Amino acid sequence: MKKLSTGISNFREIIENDYIYVDKTKTIYELIDDNFTCMLVKPKGFGKSLLISTMKEIFEGNKELFKGLYIYDKWDWTNKYNVIHLDFKKINYETPEKLEQSLYDFLVKIADKYEIELWGTLLNSNFSFLIEDIHKKTDKKVVVLIDGYDKPTIDSIENIELAKEILSDLFSFFTVLKASGKHLKFVFLTGVTKSFETSIFSGFNNVFDLTTHYQYPNICGFTQDEFESYYFEYINKFSKDKNIETRKLIDLINRWYGGYSWNGKDFLINPKSAFSFISTAKFDNYWFENSKTPFLIDLIKNNQEEVEELIQNKQTYVSDINNLEIERIDVNQFLLQNGFLSLKKEKRAKSLQTYYEVYIPNREVKKSLNEIIAK
């Protein structure tokens, strides 16, 4: 059996070490072939970092890594692009000053790679200059991949003033991308939540949000068909070892770790939880341990009545699935964007206002919420 890629988000490492890779390159090919500036919001553990890593290898023209995958004989591998890959997990954002310095240090590393000298210490000017100069020096446009664009703001949200200051700095930094359009081939940003999206992306034109778009519902996460196909040997082994029918086992996996939807039609299994289950052969709560924060726990406890209604499967609605107000967080909206709730259906009131019915997707999430409330 091929190995499980638990915790690995580097595409090259997965391929070169013969780990299982669920082929998402058909969807990636369709996305990058037709769009310019895109964003994707999904909860932790759904494979956003792996998606960006895969895109990086495609744009850099590393064809040999894609042998046997959909994109192998579709993409024009003679076109190679310069990739700037910014991962906010590797950026220090404890204070606005540390955020600015860490981003500047990141730009210096990119500049050194292309033997480009930055001008002074102005962050945004240097970012703009760097993109332009890489294009001019190599005669190839630049691809910018940003992983966790919202992480500095979300992780600072317990301190509203700090979060607002960091948000302002990020807005200025990201605005450079709009001004650099003629030097760019493709821009892709991922995050955990659409919180404050309006502020961050108000400087952009035509940002394509594929989070709920009908063409790309399965770009992250596993469909049931994908899970059954790629992990059949593991499922079959567990089924025999535990003396449980395969179909019943798959149904249990869905009840525990599936049920995620961002359009009410296509449903996904949480990859991190599914990996952990296969590795341990035990139904348990895996995903939440890496998703909980003090802010989230306090938010749930401070809105215990609403959360208990969710746990009791009462109908619950969210009027806006996109933009959170930084100074007034709606608990259901925040839970939806962070993977604790899922979209059931979109509805329209008599006033024609759109609202959304939401629900707890699976046993793992319900168990997590119960544990928080019980403490």
Protein language model regions, located:
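Phosphate-binding site recognition
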Residues: M1-K375
